[in-house]
Structure formats: C-alpha cells, structure tokens
Amino acid sequence: MTDYSSASPKAVRELIREGKIATPTTGMCAGYAQGNLVVLPKELAWDFLLFCQRNPKSCPLLEVADAGSRTFPIFGAGSDIARDIPKYRVYENGVMTGEYTDVSAFFDDPSRELVSFLIGCSFSFESALLEAGVPVRQIEEGVHVPMYHTNISCAPAGVFSGNMVVSMRPIPTAP
C-alpha cells in the first residue's frame, strides 16, 4: 500500500479521479481537514442545513456548494465532487441503491438539482495522533475506522433525524 500521508489533497483527488486510489482515505493528506460528502436534492437542502446547525458534533459543516455545483471553492478548489472520492454510496428514500466510483450522471441529470455538503471527518485528527506517537490501528491495517450507532439522539430538523454515530480508535496503554 502506498503512503499518501504527505500528499496534497489536490494530488490525492487527481489520483482518485484517475482510478489509482480506490481505498478509504484514512491516513492520507496529513495536516489537512478531510470531509464526508452529502449530496441531496435542493428541496431537502434547507432541512439538512438546519440539521447540521443543530448537531455540530455529529455533522460539523465545513462548506455548502451552490445548487448544481460540482466543486467546493473554499475547501476543494479545482475539485470535482462527482469523481474525486474513491467510492460513493447512493441512497434513495433511505435505501442504498448502489455504489459508484463516478456519480457524474446524477449531477448531469437535468431533472435533479443537487446541493452538496462537506461534513468534517474524524480522519482529520489522525495525523495529530501519529505525530504524538500514538498508533492508529486502521491506518496500520489498511482498514476503515470502526463506527458505532449510539442511543444518543440528534436534534431533528425537517425530515432529518436519528441517533449519533461515533468512530472509535483503540489506543494502547502508555508504556
């Protein structure tokens, strides 16, 4: 597995776009914020924006793209939302309908006006752990970070509600 920890976000996005990276991005681009992408029909965007505002620990909102835009000008200048992520999971009416490496067709569909949200990701603090000498097991093993559904309710907003999901990292005891 190639080490992309010192790579720039732009370089990693280009490699993903070229199909050269197809794995989760944990451990990549140390020192940069990483984000999760949520893309919704415009008619749901306001409710989701409120959901993020009411639940900043669960959904730390980094940026919202203009309707129909495929880039985040502040956090991802030159990015292509539809092609710069190793794997997209598409949900319709709460059910996963497919996994894709390119979702351009969804953005190109004139019947859809989509709004994209960039949500902060726990991968962002992993470089600080590594710099402090704390091993990050999922990076060492090349697997995805463990995530758990809790019984902690998020504050609802419009059609959006649910319980908080947390990520966990096993930390060894100090010597």
Model-derived regions: residue spans:
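Long, contiguous binding/interaction regions
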Residues: 2-21
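N-terminal start-of-chain detector that recognizes signal peptides
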Residues: 7-13, 33, 87-90, 108, ...
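Amphipathic, alpha-helical segments enriched in basic
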Residues: 12, 20-23, 27, 104, ...
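A short linear-motif detector with a strong N-terminal bias
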Residues: 14-18, 41, 67-68, 95-96, ...
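N-terminal low-complexity or amphipathic/hydrophobic leaders
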Residues: 22-100
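Conserved mixed alpha/beta catalytic, RNA-binding, or beta-rich assembly cores of soluble enzyme
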Residues: 91-93, 99-175
